[in-house]
Amino acid sequence: MNLLVIGAHPDDGEYRVAGTAVKLAARGHRVKFLNLTDGGAGHHEISGPALAARREKESAESRRRLGIDAIETWSVPDGELMPTLELRREVIRRIREWQADVVITHRPNDYHPDHRYCSVLVQDAAFMVT
């Protein structure tokens, strides 16, 4: 089975799906986390490129520790995700490339706008990819 976890930010997949990802990866399933923004906001001490770089390193370490196959992070600025046609097409492309059997994402009524828009993108992409 191929699992694709699509989150708005680096660390969203780890917070929400790490247990499932570890169990599936340990059983030989392919697991990928896709982060739609760079994670450059939301910290009280650093932000922008410095925080995005830190999150990229954290993602690499998460991949190693969780034993998952891949983590991809897009360059969309944190806090600026919008459910555009262009991004929907990119999500569709990633679902097809990974040959995802299961896609997990945010709930549509989340408190964070990036989480809500990520959910919309994935819902729309899932409809279009079939």
Regions found by a protein language model. Give the residues of each.
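Metal-dependent de-N-acetylase/amidase catalytic core
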Residues: 1-6, 82-130
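Active-site rim/loop-helix segments in enzyme catalytic domains that contact anionic ligands
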Residues: 1-98
